[in-house]
Amino acid sequence: GAVFLMLMVGFTINLLTLLAIVLSVGLVVDDAIVMVENVERHIQLGEKPFPAAIKAARELVGPIIAMTITLAAVYLPIGIQGGLTGALFREFAFTLAGAVIISGVVALTLSPMMASKLLREGDHDRGFAGFVNRRFEAFRKTYTRWLTNTLNYRPILFTVWAIVVALIFPFYMFSARELAPKEDQSVVFGVIQASANSTLDQTKLFTKQVYDVYHSFPESQSVFQITSPTGGFGGVVTKPWSERKKSTQQLQVEAAMGFSKIPGLRVISLVPPPLPGGGSFPVDFVIASTAEPQQLSDFANQLVGKAFASGLFMFADSDLKFDQPQAEVVFDRDKLRSQGVDLSKAGQDLSTLLGGNYVNRFSIQGRSYKVIPQIKRAERLTPDQLEGIYVTGKDEKLVPLSTFATLKTTTEPRDLKKFQQLNAVRIQGVIPPGVSLNTALTMLESEAAKILPKGFTVDYAGESRQLRTEGRKFLGTFLLSGILIYLVLAAQFESFRDPFIILAGSVPLALSGALLFPFLGATTINIYSQIGLITLVGLVSKNGILIVEFANKLQEQGRDKVHAVIEAATTRLRPILMTTAATVMGHMPLVFARGPGAGARNSIGITLVSGMIIGSVFTLFFVPAIYVLVARTHKKVESVDENGEKTQPELVEVAV
C-alpha cells in the first residue's frame, strides 16, 4: 500500500523512502495486534469467533482511529518544513504517514474478518499457546498487584515522574550533536597545500609520496590525484565493506599520520560529508568585520592556536594567508626621462617578456599554433633576475632595467574573502572520530567571544552552517507535532484532559529514555535521531490511548475512577506489551546495522528502541496515576430497552 501511494504521488525509491519502509514494518502491525488481541480476549470470555470479532471491532474503532491519526499527524510537520531537513525527509515522512493510515484501515476491516475465520474457541488453552497464556496470566496478576500498590503512593510516583522529566534537559543539552552521523562512503580524500610560490615541478616532487601513502593501504582499490602548482586534490577509493576490516574513518586517521611525514607539503585527510552541500571541511567557522585583512588574520591565527590546544581538531587553519611573495618594479621617472625611455613602452616590453601573452598565430602543415613570446624560464626564476632584463630605449637601443628601476618585495595574501559584503576569514578544520561537530563549534564560539572585539561577528558556512540552521528547527517541529497530536486527541476524546493524561504519562518519559543513550555516547543528536524522537511521540501515545479510552468506558459502566483505570491497564497490558515488542523487534535490525549507511540507521534505531522500551514500562504505571489525578469522573450511562425501561449496561468481567 505504501509503495502504491509512492507511485501515485511520484515519489522515488531512494535510501530515505527505503528507510521509511523498514520503519513501517515495526509500526503498521500495532493496530492489527490490538484488534486481534481484543478478538482473542472476547473468545476467551466465552463468545463465538464472529460475534467476538464484531464486538472487538466496535470497541476499538475509536482507539484505532485515534492512534492512526496521531501517528500520521506526527510526520506532517516534518514533511512541510523547508530547508535541508524538509528536502531530505519529505518523501520519508509522507511515505510513513501513508503506511500508517493504510495499517489503520486494514486493522478495522481485514484484521477482524481474518480473526473471525482463523481463531477458534479453546485454542488458547492448548499446546504452546496455552502455556504462554498461563504464564502471561500469572504476570498480569503480578502487574495488577504492583499497579494497585503503586497507586497508593501517588505522591512518590509523581516525584519520580518529575525527576525523570527533568532529566530530559541535561540529557539533551550535554549530548554530542552533529548534522548527521559520519558514514563510510568508501572514499578518503586528501587536500594538498603547497607554498604560495611553488611551481608545478616542485609540487610534483612531493605529491608522489601522497600517492604512495594511499596506495600502501591493503583496503585500497584505486587512487586518484590532481596536482596544481600550489596544491592539489587526491584520494583513495576503498574496497567494498565486505572485503575490508577497517572503516574509512580509521583510514582517515592512518592517512593523516602518513601525511605528517611528507616534507614540503601540507596534506589534510578527510572523508566526504554525510549529506550533500556540506563543503570539504566539517568545521567552517567565519569571522567577518570591516577591519583590515591583516587584523582579521591575526585573530584567526589566535583561534587556530586555541583549536589545536583544545585537542578537538585533527587539522585547523584559516584561509587568509599573508604568504604570497610579490615583487614590484618601481620606476624612477627622472631617470626614465634622462635616458629617453618611454614609460608605456617599458611596461609593454616587460609584459611581453614575462607575461606569456598570446600575440599571433602561425600555421605548419595545416595546423595553427599560438605565438607566445617569453624569456627562458631559467632567466626568470627569481626577482633579482629582473635587473638583467633590457627594454627598448631611445633610437631603439636596449637599456638595462636596473638603470632606472628598483625592486620592492612584499608579502600579500593569496586572496581576500568577502562574507555578506564584509571582509572575512574562514577557519576550517577536521575533527577526529569520537568528537562531535557541535563540540568543536562550541569551543570556537567560546574562544571567539573572548578574543574578538566589538565590530566582529561570527557565522558559519558549509556543514557547520547546516548544523546551526537545521538544528534550531527541531524544537519548533517537535512542538508543532505535539500540538497537532494534542488537538487530534482532544477532538477524538472530546476532552482536553484526556490528551494531557496520554501525553504527560508517556511522551516525556519515553524522551528521557531515548536521550539517555546519546548522553552516554552510544549515538549523537542529529537529524536522524531527531526524526526518531518525533516518531516516538506518536508511538508511545498509542499505549496511553488504549488505557484512557478503556478506563472511560469502564467508568460509564459504573466503575469508580481508580478501579476503572486499574482494570483498563490490566486489560490492555497484553496489547501494549505485544505492540511494544513488535516495534522493538521491527527496529532492532537498525540498531545492529553495519556497513554503508549504518550511521543513520543506528541513530534512528537506537532512539526508537530505547525510547519504546523505557517509555512503555513507565506508561504502564504513570498513565494510571495521572489518570486518577486529572481525569474527570464519567457518570454511569444507563441505556433504555425496547419497553422504555432503564437498564444497566453489561460490565466487562476481567479477572484481576
Labelled PLM ranges:
Residues 1, 25-35, 39, 60-80, ...:
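Transmembrane alpha-helices and their membrane-interface boundaries in multi-pass membrane transporters
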Residues 36, 268, 297, 304-481, ...:
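Extracytoplasmic/periplasmic membrane-proximal domains and adjacent transmembrane bundles
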Residues 11-12, 78-88, 158, 162-198, ...:
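Transmembrane helices with small-residue packing motifs
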Residues 189, 201-279, 304-305, 334-356:
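Solvent-exposed, membrane-proximal periplasmic/extracellular interface segments of envelope transport
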Residues 10, 53-65, 85-97, 139-154, ...:
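Alpha-helical membrane-interface segments at transmembrane helix boundaries
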Residues 60, 128-179, 236, 261, ...:
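Signature of alpha-helical transmembrane segments and their immediate interfacial
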